[in-house]
Amino acid sequence: MATIDDVAKAAGVSTSTVSYVLSGKRPISAPTRARVERAIDKLGYRPHAGARALASSRTNVIALMAPLRVGVSVPVIMQFVAGVVTRARDFNHDVLLLTQDDVSGLDRVTGGSMVDALVMMDIEADDPRVPVAAAAKQPTVLIGLPQDPEGLSCVDLDFDAAGRLAVRHLVKAGHTDIALIGSPPEVLRRHTAFAERLMRGLRDQAKISGVTVKVEACDSTPTGASEAVDTLLATAPETTGIIVHNEGALPHVLARLAERGAVVGTDMSVVAVCPTDVALSQRIPMTSIDLPAEDIGKVAVDMVMARLESEQPSETRLLAPVLTERESSADGPAGPLD
């Protein structure tokens, strides 16, 4: 059976262009439309019922696209899922969980009458799913912030502000040599939006504060964490303040620092960006910037249901980061600033 990808390839256009031809939501030039329609006829492509006009009856189902890609923290993903599922039940809706990231799967779900609305996670800076979702008739809310949301509403932690807040905290404590042990290389190669936004905020604040910041990508494994710590201490041995933005690697980073003789909370200050339960489950309670994953999931459902009930302009909600100081904080060589 032909898919939207097959049509796009045959017509020499993007999948989003095919979606726009089907939905009529955006103007497409006559020659391009003709090529797409010829490809549809030649391949016998038939979208699921309702692709051109969503059935008026409700399915009481929300699709949640939460791709289980390499490098993601599944426990944290499940906190987002829990928030979406719990809040959806308040609206008498069930949740269809999609763990693949292919555009064809998105087209299959939005092209028919399977779901009333869609929530999408793990958003990349230039995410190929965004234009397809934007062309769909169902309302969609993104958990994440791409470079161009294309009219879709977004909700997330303000990771840019979180990066700035973490640096300000360490600078105020007297640290001038700071490092980020960040997301896995695969996450960075995909240009995942949350990781890039945190690094941007961190670097901007470091420049403003006049301090140095070294960034180390880190696999979420004991070996990956050990290699990141060893590389950091070899190339920047003067580092006294570390920000960890990698839930899976966090316990292994702390273990390797201990093996290397660094006492966290005394001669090394560590700030984690993670859910509070992750911060509290480490060998010592971690100073952390909370990632309120479950709350973000609930807000996403509130937003998408509001758009399902009535026409509303798109919006972006970025939750302000909150830092809680615990036992992993320590004063830096310069001493705390007044």
Per-region residue spans from a language model:
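N-terminal helix-turn-helix DNA-binding module of bacterial transcription factors
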Residues: 1-60, 333-338
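Alpha-helical recognition/docking segments in bacterial nutrient-uptake
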Residues: 2, 61-168, 234
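Short acidic/polar active-site loop segments enriched in Thr and Asp
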Residues: 14, 60, 116, 176-177, ...
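Short beta-strand segments enriched in small/hydrophobic residues
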Residues: 17-20, 57-70, 177-187
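Glycine-rich phosphate-binding loop signature in dinucleotide/nucleotide-binding domains
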Residues: 43, 173-175, 232-238
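Hinge/beta->alpha junction and helix N-cap segments in small-molecule ligand-binding domains
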Residues: 67-75, 100-103, 155-165, 181-228, ...
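Flexible loop/turn connectors
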Residues: 226, 235-338
